[in-house]
Amino acid sequence: MNETMIHCWDGHVSSLKIAIVIADSSGEPFEEIKTALHPGIWERLAFLGVDIFYVKGEEPTGLQQILNNFSEGLRYSKFWPVQNLLDRFLLLKFNSRIPSCSVNQQFIEVKICEGLRTLGVKMLSAYRYIYQENYDYIFKTTLSSIVNEEVFLSFIEDLPKEGIIYGGTPVNFGKHPFASGSNTLLNRAALEFIFDHVNHWNHGFLDDVAMGRIFEGIAEVTPIASLHIESMDQINRISSHEIKQTIHFRCKSRSEPRNDVEIIRELKKRLKASEDDDTI
């Protein structure tokens, strides 16, 4: 990867080393999104020197897929405490032994089976690689997300230079707030804190919830302006000013089949139009 990061926007130059890590996934609508949009939707940030990675696990075996399905069936039911205890126990070994990964161009390939229950393990492996490669910031997101590039980079540049940065879309989860896994920003101090306390990571929770528990009482979520776009009609109702001021967009439609690709393409057009309009 690049040894020196130089980002230029509005005549500004920064030497921050930034990585964007996208939690890869298989099946639909993700295959359609990857085929139609990736990695092209990140090409502008890549041109500015930001490194883009897709984090992949291994294809689950038949038995592993049965366990994945069983876990997810419990997770969203009244029996979720059983799921939490079961996955926490079965994945406990990864608190002391994060699996290795290999890097093939833009892909960080982790030696763990794919699945929501192992997403935290997969991302911890990717975070360790990013930390070892001396990145200043890591932004974790999803295949159905995009960012407003110039606002994104300016936001990072203006952050405090000291202390833990744990940023994202704040999610109020009772007494346990956390940053949404589709929009999470961490600096080196945050990554270091995670690895120093990884033995407390609860793999019974999804990765973003587990991360929130790690930072609980230590660092509050630094809000990153975000919009969750669910339909084409919603895009048409959003003002150009709001689009220009928003950093992160989660484009996850409610329709069946999902039309995330159409939404992302239209949103990219609106972003381009807002950049070209100096009156906004």
What do these predicted ranges mean?
Residues 1-29:
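N-proximal low-complexity "stem/linker" segments adjacent to membrane-targeting elements
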Residues 55-134:
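Active-site-proximal specificity loops/subdomain of glycosyltransferases
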Residues 20-22, 52, 69, 183-185:
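Conserved, well-structured core segments
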Residues 201-280:
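C-terminal catalytic/acceptor-binding lobe
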Residues 116, 120, 137-141, 145-218, ...:
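Conserved catalytic core of nucleotide-sugar-dependent glycosyltransferases
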Residues 36-49:
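Short, acidic, metal-binding catalytic loop of nucleotide-sugar glycosyltransferases
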Residues 26-27, 56-61, 172:
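Short beta-alpha junction loops
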Residues 16-17, 47-50, 135-136, 161-165, ...:
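Loop/turn elements at helix/coil->beta-strand transitions in domains of secreted/extracellular proteins
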